Amino acid sequence: MPVPKKKTSKARSRRRYAVWLGKAKLQAQRAMTIGRAILSGRNTGFYYPKAKSEEEEGEE
């Protein structure tokens, strides 16, 4: 089984971790932006199923 020849340096592992955290932060920011757009009614660029109103439920 292959194994690494040398130990990964602290600087390299911290840099990788920082990149990973940055990507996670960006995804969280995008999710919050989309959520705000949906709640404020400014959403035009994507589709999501709307909840049925009480009037529509009575018809079925």
Curated annotation (Swiss-Prot):
The similarity comment for this entry is:
Belongs to the bacterial ribosomal protein bL32 family.
**Protein's name according to its UniProt entry:** Large ribosomal subunit protein bL32
A Pfam family of the record is Ribosomal_L32p
Organism of provenance: Synechococcus sp. (strain JA-3-3Ab)
What InterPro entries does the database record attribute to this sequence?
Answer: Ribosomal_bL32 (IPR002677)
The record's keywords, sorted A to Z, are:
Ribonucleoprotein, Ribosomal protein
MF terms from GO for this chain are: structural constituent of ribosome
**Which gene is this protein's source?**
rpmF
GO cellular component terms attached to this protein's record: large ribosomal subunit
Which BP terms in the Gene Ontology apply to this protein? translation
